[in-house]
Amino acid sequence: MAKNKIRVRYAPSPTGHLHIGNARTALFNYLFARHNKGTFVIRIEDTDTKRNIADGENSQLDNLKWLGMDWDEGPDKPGNYGPYRQSERREIYTPLIQELVEKGLAYESYKTEDELTAEREAQKAAGEAPRYVYEYEGMSDDEIKASQEAARAKGLQPVVRLRLPKDHVYKFDDIVKGEISFESDRLGGDFVIMKRDGMPTYNFAVVVDDHLMEITHVLRGDDHIANTPKQLAVYEAFGWEPPIFGHMTLIINTETGKKLSKRDESVLQFIEQYRELGYLPEAMFNFIALLGWSPVGESELFNRQEFIKQFDPRRLSKSPASFDQKKLEWVNNQYVKQSDPNKIMDLSLDSLIKAGKIAANPDSKTIEWARHLIALYQDQMSYTAQIVEMSDVFFEEPEQLDAEALEELNNETAPVVLKEFSERLKDLTLFTAPRIMQIIKGIQKDTKIKGRLLYMPIRIATTREMHGPSLPDSIELLGKDRVLAHLEKTLAEIK
């Protein structure tokens, strides 16, 4: 590996599906690596076996690929720094933990969970911040050894804790936030680096992995800032050089003004949910890339290569990023409008089939009808699943006209227009949009009725709606029999 070549990683836990915030972390690391012709690594942090979910890893990787990201090393792309799952690296961690114990930089702790809970409650009652109290205070080496042997004889399993130096300051220069420092005495005491089951804790394993995988930069959410001093303590214990850190600001829900939380059901937060609705991966990539990072210039629409060319972590915002659902819909609409109609057809048809509007495995005639229908709405859709709601008039028989529509028809010319239109449609053999438009223009010429007084009654009567896409195309898609029935029904309602 060339000296100083940038290596970054995205290290998800398979405890859930790909969240917007995690997707942003992956995307920024990906852009940073590609901009600098570096290496992008995927590492699965699966040591929390109680919280891992079935298919969690596959979901993470599949959705990253869907967004348009690729990686150079990972569980499915072995490189020279594997394994790429923490659960497969246990034999790497164990001797390193033992090394720290032998050097006196870490030690076995046999305090039970009940004892630790009682300790924290007493501290809380005294108005003190909770912290681990060293259990061997004042003991000689022989006394410590005897205490540990007695605990083992009782069948107790130890954790291993890293010994923190007193009055020490952990300092790092963050790419986003500048210099940050923590005092060792405020970190809650010596912290666990190996759990009772022999597995390393996150703050130990992540340091070992980043060091051995030669990670040069760590870009992650600022909820990890509190972990950084503990990780620096592990780096110092081994005498290793830490990577350069950059902590991205939180993502705020624009509607609530609060941090985007997985428990907040007021907004969709998982990539799979947007895939199901027919959002386009290029649009999602574009939108997520602007959550807390600003390019040069005023444009808000970029393709992947443009983002790679521009990406500079020094342009990451120090202020929280706003997750605006309406903005996402706008961005996706821009991409939908520019997309190949065949692509939008496939996504929209899938939504119509899932909604039961069109039968599975439709015949060629139905497919062509659907293609015409979907093309009518392509420019209007924020996401392709919207076709189901937008096109409801073509699948469901309408209810009575509402008061606003009836008021629009409450004039002398509306019945004239509708009767003329109905009579002329009956004689129409080629029921196509151009021929329908000819009839409308013929009515205008013969009756001198034009504009809203001409088009609105026809739209309301035929589609039973006051707004919609191209009127002649809509009438063609509804079909002659349905349109004539709608006209008859409307004329009866306005008598």
Curated annotation (Swiss-Prot):
GO terms for molecular function: ATP binding; glutamate-tRNA ligase activity; tRNA binding; zinc ion binding. A motif ('KMSKS' region) lies at residues 259-263. It comes from the Bacteria. Keywords: Aminoacyl-tRNA synthetase, ATP-binding, Cytoplasm, Ligase, Nucleotide-binding, Protein biosynthesis. It catalyses: tRNA(Glu) + L-glutamate + ATP = L-glutamyl-tRNA(Glu) + AMP + diphosphate. The keyword Chaperone does not apply. Its EC number is 6.1.1.17. A motif ('HIGH' region) lies at residues 12-22. GO terms for cellular component: cytosol. GO terms for biological process: glutamyl-tRNA aminoacylation. It is found in: Cytoplasm. It holds the Pfam family Anticodon_2. The keyword Aminoacyl-tRNA synthetase applies. ATP binds at residue 262. Monomer. Belongs to the class-I aminoacyl-tRNA synthetase family. Glutamate--tRNA ligase type 1 subfamily. Catalyzes the attachment of glutamate to tRNA(Glu) in a two-step reaction: glutamate is first activated by ATP to form Glu-AMP and then transferred to the acceptor end of tRNA(Glu). This is Glutamate--tRNA ligase. It comes from Latilactobacillus sakei subsp. sakei (strain 23K). The gene is gltX.
